[in-house]
């Protein structure tokens, strides 16, 4: 199974999660700015990762997903966000953003870099769902 993780990160949290997922799946973590060069049709699984700021994900990630929505819809796809919220508030935010992207499998992570270093169990659970 070939996996690509396309992410948008500003403080490194989303990038850390993307790289962790790539290391566990044998996949490739690619910043959205470089993802335009990738042919998504050559991957079995497409994971989209974004950071949340002011209730939304970066515009370039939204544009990327919209431009590739037909290919993403044909793939095993998943979405994650790194956000400041925990619990129900974080889940609701993630649910809303995943619905906007039309991706059913999704998860949210708080403090991605710290999570990867100290307790990646939640990320491992997300990976298992792929």
Label the model's feature ranges.
Residues 29-36:
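A short glycine-rich beta-strand->turn/loop micro-motif centered on a GG-aromatic cluster
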């Amino acid at each position: 199974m070939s996996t690509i993780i396309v992410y948008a990160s500003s403080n490194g949290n989303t990038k850390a999660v993307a790289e962790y997922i790539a290391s566990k799946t044998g996949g490739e973590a690619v910043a959205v700015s470089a993802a335009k060069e990738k042919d998504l049709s050559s991957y079995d699984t497409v994971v989209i990762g974004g950071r949340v700021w002011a209730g939304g994900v970066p515009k370039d990630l939204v544009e990327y997903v919209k431009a590739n929505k037909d290919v993403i819809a044909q793939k095993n796809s998943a979405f994650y966000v790194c956000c400041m919220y925990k619990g129900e508030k974080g889940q609701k935010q993630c649910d809303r953003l995943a619905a906007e992207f039309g991706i059913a499998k999704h998860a949210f992570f708080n403090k991605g870099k710290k999570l990867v270093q100290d307790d990646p169990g939640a990320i491992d659970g997300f990976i298992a769902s792929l």
